Regions:
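Short, structured segments at the rim of ligand-binding sites
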Residues: 1-167
Length: 167
């Protein structure tokens, strides 16, 4: 949404309406994006386009915010800018993000999970690869794996034994 010059509304239902979205109110305006929120909660109205700049973000809140910024910076053609991160809690999820970004031709230098440096990126809102198989979710498979351990042999497909998933 932050890449679009048109205003885009984001909403949700249930518990999503109570989740804090202050991150967007705090960070996106620093990147040239207009944000209207409901006191830091959904619904949000976002209007870009995002202009990548050197920023610092709090990584203790959620890796999802950093994941979105990493992809948005790449798609916007970030050049010679950094995202500095304080207290990143979910490194394995950032590894998944960087792995998928690389597969699609978007690369960023990861400097000890504290700084992500973008150099000479070309604006590319459309990744180069069209097909990608999303690996299975180890957390979701845990119950089936336990059932197999108790009841006998079981085969589960789609799980990557080399996955960087945290679970």
């Amino acid at each position: 949404a932050a890449l679009s010059h048109l205003p885009i509304s984001l909403t949700g239902t249930g518990s999503l309406l109570t989740r804090p979205m202050d991150f967007f109110d705090e960070i996106l305006p620093k990147l040239g994006v207009k944000v209207l929120s409901n006191k830091g909660k959904l619904p949000l109205q976002i209007q870009g386009p995002l202009q990548p700049a050197n920023i610092e973000v709090d990584g203790s809140l959620s890796s999802q915010f950093l994941t979105g910024l990493l992809m948005a910076y790449s798609a916007a053609g970030a050049n010679d800018v950094t995202i500095a991160v304080k207290e990143l809690k979910s490194k394995p999820y950032i590894d998944l993000t960087l792995q998928i970004m690389k597969h699609f031709g978007w690369e960023v230098d990861n400097i000890d999970y504290k700084t992500f440096f973008f150099r000479n990126a070309v604006p590319n809102p459309q990744p180069k690869t069209t097909y990608y198989t999303i690996e299975g979710d180890w957390s979701g498979a845990a119950f089936l794996l336990v059932a197999g351990a108790i009841a006998g042999p079981i085969t589960i497909k789609g799980l990557d034994t080399c996955s960087t998933q945290a679970d």
